[in-house]
């Protein structure tokens, strides 16, 4: 791996970890913990993006102390590969093409996360998802279905916003900077 | 949450891989067991690890902070709202299979959180880097783990400064969810574009320090890795493999 790729990967990991702070300041019901992974997939390629996703997952565990969420690392791999394919077909060229692509990723990522959340954690995962699961279970929905619905619905919103965000970042890149990322140019 | 806590315990002096291997073994064994007793034995093992390192006071507070909300939700989802048969417990009717499942899931989370917090408290980042370098781990992985943690506070400060600057220019971060969504773009865009613009400068700085030389680095004072510790780590691998083989063949 080239030194430049390493520096961009570090940037992607930092974006993943810091945007959560901005989202928390705005009290938004999102995670946005994969913006860096998606951005690096579009700018550099799939392997760099997978590295961003996995390193983010490990460092998030180191910083929060909660290592029980490491199994969700597989979702970051799916996000990286999907975002790379989306970039290859030009989904990030406009926010209104990025939004539906993000929505589809939300369905895929949420559907993959749901069995992990159900079988390994019994549906007790993170803030917003956990609240939706508990509310759906309280109205009598079977737990497995409640976990699936809460996971997919929150991921659809989250990944749509993340894709639109990355599209806006790529569109705002000055030409001089854009030319330094051949995968995107 | 919790970082390295200086100390003189055996695990503090051990090779950094040893406490990390112990924590990883607790994680993998916790997922291998699916009945309450062995899972809570893992919690006991993690507590003994924290006690042995003299970091139990530093570990227990953050561990309870992390695990308690999950335990409460598990109790509601599986105990109160779980499947019959139900048994009275004080003023509540709790699902018997639900409580057993909540005990397994909650125990796993408790064991993993306590074991890793104890490992983080005993592993000095500098010794870990020396240990990895001595083992011939390439520059890339070490750079990603250590440099990212060094850079993170700086980027967080920058995010806070951008937030203040945009607020001074009239950006409102309150109001309806839609208004707060709109505020996301003027905060994230300058942060990411500013960081991307600095990439070349950082590459140059690393090149001048010989990061791309490809020569194997030699740490000045690498941590010792006695045979006993290597055997212990190998033993942990064997225990984990046996436990998972037993789990996959339905013997436990």
Task: Explain the meaning of each model-derived region.
Chain A
Residues 31-39, 73-78, 160:
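Membrane-embedded alpha-helical segments of multi-pass membrane proteins
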Residues 13-17, 57, 76-80, 102, ...:
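Residue-level recognition of pore/gate-forming positions within transmembrane alpha-helices
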